[in-house]
Amino acid sequence: MCKCGVEFRLGVLSKPNQKNMNKKYYYYIIFGITFLLFNLVQDNIRPNYDGGNSLIIYFLGVIPNFLPGIGLPSFFYVIIPEVFKPHSFFFKERLKLSIYISMFGLISNEFITIFTPGRGIFDWNDILWTLIGGGLFLTIHRKIN
C-alpha cells in the first residue's frame, strides 16, 4: 500500500474505503434499470404483444407493478441521506422509510384505480407483485451490505 491509501490486489487498484462510498451507485443503477425496463414493458412490449400465452400476458400485466417495487425504494434509499442529516430519524431509518413510502404510494395508486374510471383496472395481483418487488429490494439491499 502506498501513502495515498491505494493498494494493488490481484491486479486491481483499490482504496479500502472506496467500497463503502460506491455502494450508493448500486442503488442508482438498480433504480435506472428497473425504470428503463418499466418503460420498455409499459410502452413497447405490452401494447405490441399479440400472442395468446396466458402466462406471458399475466407477467406483462404485473411487471409494471413489480419493477417500481424494487426501483422506488432503491431511489429513496439514496435520496434520504442527501436530504436529511446523518443523526436524524429519517437518516437512521432510511431503509424502512424507503420501503414504507414506496409501498404506500404504489399500493395507493392501485386503489385509486377503483375510483377513477379509465385510469386503470384494480387488481390484487398487482398489489401482491408490488410487495414481492419490495421484498426483492430488501434482499438486494442485504446482499449489497
Region locations from a protein language model:
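Short, Lys/Arg-enriched N-terminal segments with co-localized hydrophobic residues
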Residues: 3-5, 9-20
